[in-house]
Design a protein with these regions (language model features):
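Alpha-helical transmembrane segments and their immediate juxtamembrane cytosolic regions
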Residues: 1-391
């Protein structure tokens, strides 16, 4: 956003400056998140198998690691939304702010569901290998055909599963080391890039890989098979340099820094937009001229280093203060709920998060639906044994 005549103006840089859309091919990194997640889930499942840990115990540990940092963010914004409501702030304003702050949570709404299915998808990978990946990709392609050709738009929302499950399978391939030489990996990358290029320039898909200036059409809302192609492109390119990166990380200091960042990565991800909102509010009340610059102008670009510096000044202390929630291990003596109970609670968490990521607090298609979504997340957390009140 920027300030014009003393008021905030919400705008889309991709719509105002369409020539910048190519940057989204670089900065759309969600496929990498799911690929790394697939690798991590494979490692975790292998460890659980060696230790004789059953599904319920494994799932309890994974949910604790994922949901605990999320609850802090939701609690904070839930309290703030209530304070804004009783202060007389317009519901649309509260919705705009909270929706922006909670956008990162959509990832967990999908990833938690994928984690619950990980034992099945990993078994499918072990049995069928790349055929399991191709089967999911084919299903995703069929859904896109239904979306565009048959105009069954509602089916597009199922792509949150098919697209991201396909990309997640790449993480299993990485873990198994069945990818070949760096040259072969670069071939994967070129194949992904060529497929993405063909889909966009010969198909109905928009160019932008983050958001879209095209009304009602996006590669991400809901996901499209273009994200699979982008994921393959990124996957091949990054893994082609895995060996030199491993040598680089043999340095004790670099490895220690990597471990430190990994221990707080969920905090960084979940809170970065909240910090951006804080910086915007501070700059607005400080009459900061940075906010009066129209996005995309040369002056606006010149101010980006200062803007990023302000973000880091607030984000870094917060990152070091909050990871206690992220790093805190699940108590060894904590009872483990039965698997069906955990699954039911996790589904409730996913549904509540999905709603809040889409609509935020303060305004709802039906009255009090935002409150119901928040309560659903809390109740699901209790049901899954993630709250101290669990017995």
């Amino acid at each position: 956003p920027w300030v014009q005549d003393g008021s905030f103006v919400a705008g889309d840089l991709l719509e105002m400056r369409p020539q910048m859309q190519w940057l989204t091919w670089i900065f759309q990194v969600m496929p990498i998140f799911f690929i790394v997640g697939g690798y991590a889930n494979a490692v975790s499942l292998e460890s659980a198998h060696r230790k004789g840990t059953r599904y319920a115990g494994w799932l309890a540990g994974r949910l604790h690691r994922l949901v605990t940092p999320l609850l802090g963010l939701l609690m904070g914004w839930g309290v703030l939304a209530m304070a804004l409501y009783f202060s007389g702030v317009a519901g649309d304003t509260t919705r705009l702010v909270t929706r922006a702050a909670l956008i990162p949570t959509w990832f967990l709404a999908i990833y938690i569901a994928i984690v619950m299915l990980a034992p099945l998808t990993y078994r499918a990978w072990q049995r069928w290998g790349f055929a399991s990946l191709l089967g999911l990709a084919a299903l995703a392609a069929l859904v896109d055909v239904a979306f565009f050709v048959a105009e069954l738009r509602w089916m597009g929302w199922t792509q949150y599963f098919w697209v991201w499950l396909t990309v997640h399978q790449l993480g299993y391939a990485w873990r198994d080391g069945r990818l070949g030489s760096p040259a072969r990996l670069l071939g994967w990358s070129l194949l992904g890039f060529a497929t993405l290029w063909a889909l966009i320039f010969n198909g109905p898909y928009p160019f932008a890989m983050v958001g879209s200036p095209d009304e009602g059409l996006s590669n991400t809302l809901p996901p499209k098979i273009t994200l699979i192609a982008l994921g393959v492109c990124q996957f091949g390119l990054l893994l082609s340099i895995e060996a030199p990166m491993r040598r680089l990380l043999s340095s004790v200091r670099l490895w220690a820094a990597t471990v430190l960042i990994n221990s707080m990565i969920m905090t960084l991800y979940l809170w970065h937009i909240t910090v951006m909102i804080v910086v915007v509010v501070i700059a607005y009340f400080a009459a900061n001229s940075v906010l009066t610059l129209e996005p995309g102008t040369s002056e606006w670009w010149a101010s980006r280093p200062l803007w990023i510096l302000l973000l880091y000044v607030i984000l870094l202390p917060l990152t070091f203060a909050l990871p206690g929630l992220e790093r805190r291990p699940r108590p060894a003596d904590a009872p483990t709920p039965a698997a069906p109970r955990q699954i039911g609670g996790a589904i409730m968490i996913c549904l509540g998060i999905a709603y809040l990521a889409l609509f935020g607090f303060g305004s709802a298609p039906l009255p009090y639906l935002d409150i119901l979504a928040f309560v659903t997340v809390v109740a699901g957390s209790w049901l899954s044994g993630l709250l101290h009140g669990f017995r």
